[in-house]
Amino acid sequence: MAKKDKKTLPPSGAGLVRYFEEETKGPKLTPEQVVVMSIILAVFCLVLRFSG
């Protein structure tokens, strides 16, 4: 059998997008801020529901 030459890509990323390097627009929120805002929204909805 003949030995096949295996061609490998260089270990540079091979065209993959690195999302953590992409600059995004919009507010930067921590997980704690998201949880607090969700709780506030839920309480606000309950107040509106039962207030009349």
From Swiss-Prot:
Regions that span the bilayer: 31-50
Residue stretches in coiled coil: none
The entry's keywords: Cell membrane, Membrane, Protein transport, Translocation, Transmembrane, Transmembrane helix, Transport
Residues assigned to the Extracellular compartment are 51-52
Cell location: Cell membrane
**Stretches in topological domain Cytoplasmic:** 1-30
Single GO biological process annotation from the record? protein transport
One cellular component term from this protein's GO annotations in UniProt: plasma membrane
Q: Known HAMAP family for this protein?
A: SecG
Q: What does this protein do?
A: Involved in protein export. The function of the beta subunit is unknown, but it may be involved in stabilization of the trimeric complex.
| Subunit | Component of the protein translocase complex. Heterotrimer consisting of alpha (SecY), beta (SecG) and gamma (SecE) subunits. Can form oligomers of the heterotrimer.
UniProt protein name: Preprotein translocase subunit SecG
| Organism listed in the record | Methanothermobacter thermautotrophicus (strain ATCC 29096 / DSM 1053 / JCM 10044 / NBRC 100330 / Delta H) (Methanobacterium thermoautotrophicum)
Q: Which gene encodes it?
A: secG
